[in-house]
Amino acid sequence: MATKKSGGSSRNGRDSKGRRLGVKLFGGEYATIGSIIVRQRGTKILPYKNVGLGRDHTIFALKEGIVSYYKDKTKTYVSIV
């Protein structure tokens, strides 16, 4: 008979992969139609002129142009000029 119970395997060691969120095009960069500007959870950054908002709150370009960010007291907006 064993004098010690056999050691079980660890139940730790799992973690989810990163979601690759964040700003993809910064202010002053050139965006083509359909290019992703921001990947986010919720609307931390809100869409303004010439940008669209996807189902998963992704902000993307509706027209070609220069990406521009604007901030008021509480919110941040992104547009294409």
Curated annotation (Swiss-Prot):
GO terms for cellular component: mitochondrion; ribonucleoprotein complex; ribosome. It is found in: Mitochondrion. Signal peptide: none annotated. One of its GO terms (biological process) is translation. It holds the Pfam family Ribosomal_L27. Residues 1-20 are annotated as: Disordered. Residues 1-11 have a biased composition (Polar residues). Coiled coil: none annotated. Keywords: Mitochondrion, Ribonucleoprotein, Ribosomal protein. GO terms for molecular function: structural constituent of ribosome. It comes from the Eukaryota. The keyword S-adenosyl-L-methionine does not apply. Its main location: mitochondrion. The keyword Transmembrane helix does not apply. PANTHER family: LARGE RIBOSOMAL SUBUNIT PROTEIN BL27M, RIBOSOMAL PROTEIN L27. Belongs to the bacterial ribosomal protein bL27 family. This is Large ribosomal subunit protein bL27m. It comes from Reclinomonas americana. The lineage of its organism: Eukaryota, Discoba, Jakobida, Histionina, Histionidae. The gene is RPL27.
